[in-house]
Curated annotation (Swiss-Prot):
One Gene Ontology MF term: glucuronate isomerase activity
A Pfam family annotated for this UniProt entry: UxaC
HAMAP family per UniProt: UxaC
Gene designation per UniProt: uxaC
Entry keyword Isomerase: yes
Protein source organism: Klebsiella pneumoniae (strain 342)
Entry EC number(s): 5.3.1.12
UniProt keyword annotation of Isomerase present: yes
InterPro entries in UniProt: Metal_Hydrolase, Uronate_isomerase
Catalytic activity as recorded in UniProt: D-glucuronate = D-fructuronate; aldehydo-D-galacturonate = keto-D-tagaturonate
Name of the protein in question: Uronate isomerase
Amino acid sequence: MTPFMTEDFLLDTEFARRLYHDYAKDQPIFDYHCHLPPQQVAENYRFKNLYDIWLKGDHYKWRAMRTNGVPERLCTGDASDREKFDAWAATVPHTIGNPLYHWTHLELRRPFGITGKLLSPSTADEIWDQCNDLLAQDAFSARGIMKQMNVKMVGTTDDPIDSLEHHAVVAKDTSFDIKVLPSWRPDKAFNIEQATFNDYMAKLGEVSDTDIRRFADLQSALTKRLDHFAAHGCKVSDHALDVVLFAEATDAELDAILARRLAGETLSAHEVAQFKTAVLVFLGAEYARRGWVQQYHIGALRNNNLRQFKLLGPDVGFDSINDRPMAEELSKLLSKQNEENLLPKTILYCLNPRDNEVLGTMIGNFQGEGMPGKMQFGSGWWFNDQKDGMERQMTQLAQLGLLSRFVGMLTDSRSFLSYTRHEYFRRILCQMIGRWVAAGEAPADIALLGEMVKNICFNNARDYFAIELN
């Protein structure tokens, strides 16, 4: 019987253990997509307690707690921090088989140093007190944890109207050598069908000093904000393409669509598709000119529980996987961006694992001459960010493309404790390659495969995003 979560956790062959301990373990972290609050980095935030750093804002944990029968008051409600932590501690023993069980104990191990102890009601007091004592120390501030975890770069997720003032504070601080760069997330400028669109156009117009009436005005406003982001070191965009749409339009049609929407009219599905296509093609060209990377996160079915959405708002754990087809529209969109050779470096993520092979083959259609891995099939996202999901994604990428050129893992997280997801990924990667070697499916060449592992863990992402590190 193998003990739970030792130093060789998941490493079930001798070759996997060598790969992980000698090549993967000590690689720095290049976390190119996350949802960390940049203000907390700028202020070097001190966390009040374990709830504040661990449960606050974590919809993964809230979903599990609800499934375990925990009242909403103890998830997102007005219960005390300690009450919410105790509700989580009571839920954890029920999460065996869920990635939350592994994540929880990896996060207690690093950075808190808690090993050989499982979180449960019987250990909750001890773990609460031990972690809170550590959180009072300098090494456990927001920046302190990033340094402990050997982070070199994080890419936050930011709206085009954001001032980026917190990124500027971090950039000017010579005592802190971790890059904290904005990522451009223009969903609100793109989702013309949403009730909030007109208010957002007013805000975008204000910050860009642009009167947005025609489509060219919107392009001008977005260009000004792209320049603003570029001035703060941005090299990455991110789009939530819950459904991929494609429909072409003339300039006159786009002007009419925008004018009608700004006048409060409801658009047809075809008009929405025309507008979204035009925005994505325009932005893709801008990214290509600037050498940016675009990311498309495809296939989320959001805010399914309307009653809870009205009570709690979005991003609180009521989203799931969509099963809408995407292949034809995505192909047309990428081909359109590529017509003038203005398809930027692109990472495609799917939420439905049924679509893994769709994306794994799609990227091969648009690889760029002289650029290794220009088109990427992104790491297992959200509900696929677990052992089977990561194995599936990497296996299918290896079968249909080049795993060796993969840009690897990202946390996609709101928590400063989520950096152990990189460790989890690295262990799974080494386990997978180790099994290939054990089965005679890959050569037992530690130098060859060790270099490949180092590249996937860090070097490929560093080179792909072309961000100069401190």
